[in-house]
């Protein structure tokens, strides 16, 4: 546990030291920044803000996790599969996000990777995780409370759905200063406690290391943000949460621990579906929310969408609180043996 905490502190310090150099390089080279939604006027001032900051905290977190978990890879440790699988997913999804950001920023391709290209790469990465960790472990079921759901060969489909789904869900959440970074920290704290109780110290080290790196990133990402994480950060973080829940055998918990990401994704799906339905039925599309993902709806008019505009700090605080409460309830359920 002590070494895990040292790893977290090291990740925080290195990220804080490295990020200013990344931001300065970005500005000196006059690299194009992230484009903003014109519908949210207060975001227009952020145009040109350096993005791809996730590259820094991912490199730091991966390297420090490898150093502090070195014994896992050299001594045939039982946690080898889970540790290697988690770090592999963080790396590969980070590369996918990096490619997406690179095309948008350096080649001025607005959509980055085409949706089918991004999805294909995410599925391949998910399959590799399945073969690295899940298949060797013999896992093919979901445990929810006292109920065990045997999925057999279909468990691989669940794994792919979980990883790809939450990877994109965190990506949707990363829309205002500090929201995604702190939301993921809250989620990781919950999983860190579960990992500690289960005695999964190698996984705990990865979790605490990423928490340290994200807190270091938040120093520059809180409002007004000096840098954004980009897809390189958000896609990787979402996939990381998914594989950690799988490795700890508490997959169901991510629906609660990750409730903010679920809410953000659900708002987009509902908005698109309702718009298409009403356009077919009434000849014009109608909306449930002022704008999606949900954090933009809050910005434009609060919970009802018709009230005063919310500041980014207020939106952050509201969604962070929801995430913290949901994570606390989940921990009570898991640690209190209500559900495992």
UniProtKB/Swiss-Prot annotation:
The keyword Cell wall biogenesis/degradation applies. It is a multi-pass membrane protein. It holds the Pfam family MraY_sig1. InterPro entries: Glycosyl_transferase_4 (IPR000715), PNAcMuramoyl-5peptid_Trfase (IPR003524), PNAcMuramoyl-5peptid_Trfase_CS (IPR018480). PANTHER family: PHOSPHO-N-ACETYLMURAMOYL-PENTAPEPTIDE-TRANSFERASE (PTHR22926), PHOSPHO-N-ACETYLMURAMOYL-PENTAPEPTIDE-TRANSFERASE HOMOLOG (PTHR22926:SF5). Belongs to the glycosyltransferase 4 family. MraY subfamily. Catalyzes the initial step of the lipid cycle reactions in the biosynthesis of the cell wall peptidoglycan: transfers peptidoglycan precursor phospho-MurNAc-pentapeptide from UDP-MurNAc-pentapeptide onto the lipid carrier undecaprenyl phosphate, yielding undecaprenyl-pyrophosphoryl-MurNAc-pentapeptide, known as lipid I. This is Phospho-N-acetylmuramoyl-pentapeptide-transferase. The lineage of its organism: Bacteria, Bacillati, Bacillota, Bacilli, Lactobacillales. The gene is mraY.
């Amino acid at each position: 546990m002590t070494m895990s905490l040292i790893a977290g502190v090291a990740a925080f310090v290195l990220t804080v030291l490295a990020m200013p150099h990344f931001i300065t390089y970005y500005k000196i080279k006059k690299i194009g920044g992230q484009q903003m939604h014109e519908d949210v006027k207060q975001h227009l001032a952020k145009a040109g803000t350096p993005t791809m900051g996730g590259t820094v905290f991912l490199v730091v977190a991966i390297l420090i996790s490898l150093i502090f978990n070195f014994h896992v890879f050299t001594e045939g440790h039982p946690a080898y599969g889970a540790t290697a699988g988690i770090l592999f997913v963080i790396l590969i999804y980070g590369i996918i996000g990096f490619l997406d950001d690179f095309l948008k920023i350096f080649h001025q391709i607005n959509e980055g990777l085409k949706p089918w290209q991004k999805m294909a790469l995410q599925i391949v990465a998910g399959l590799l995780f399945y073969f690295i960790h899940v298949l060797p472990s013999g896992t093919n079921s979901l445990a929810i409370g006292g109920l065990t759901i045997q999925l057999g060969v279909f468990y691989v489909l669940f794994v792919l759905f979980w990883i790809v789904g939450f990877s994109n869900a965190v990506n949707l959440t990363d829309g205002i200063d500090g929201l995604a970074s702190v939301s993921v920290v809250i989620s990781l704290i919950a999983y860190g406690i579960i990992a500690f109780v289960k005695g999964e110290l190698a996984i705990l080290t990865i979790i605490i290391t990423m928490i340290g790196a994200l807190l270091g990133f938040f120093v520059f990402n809180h409002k007004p943000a000096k840098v954004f994480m980009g897809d390189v950060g958000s896609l990787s973080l979402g996939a990381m949460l998914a594989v950690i829940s799988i490795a700890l055998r508490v997959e169901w918990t991510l629906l609660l621990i990750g409730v903010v990401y679920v809410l953000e994704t659900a708002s987009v799906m509902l908005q698109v579906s309702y718009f298409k339905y009403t356009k077919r039925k009434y000849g014009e599309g109608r909306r449930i929310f002022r704008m999606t993902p949900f954090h933009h709806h809050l910005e434009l008019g609060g919970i009802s969408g018709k009230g005063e505009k919310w500041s980014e700090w207020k939106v952050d605080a509201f969604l962070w609180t929801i995430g913290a409460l949901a994570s606390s309830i989940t921990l009570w359920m898991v640690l209190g043996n209500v559900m495992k």
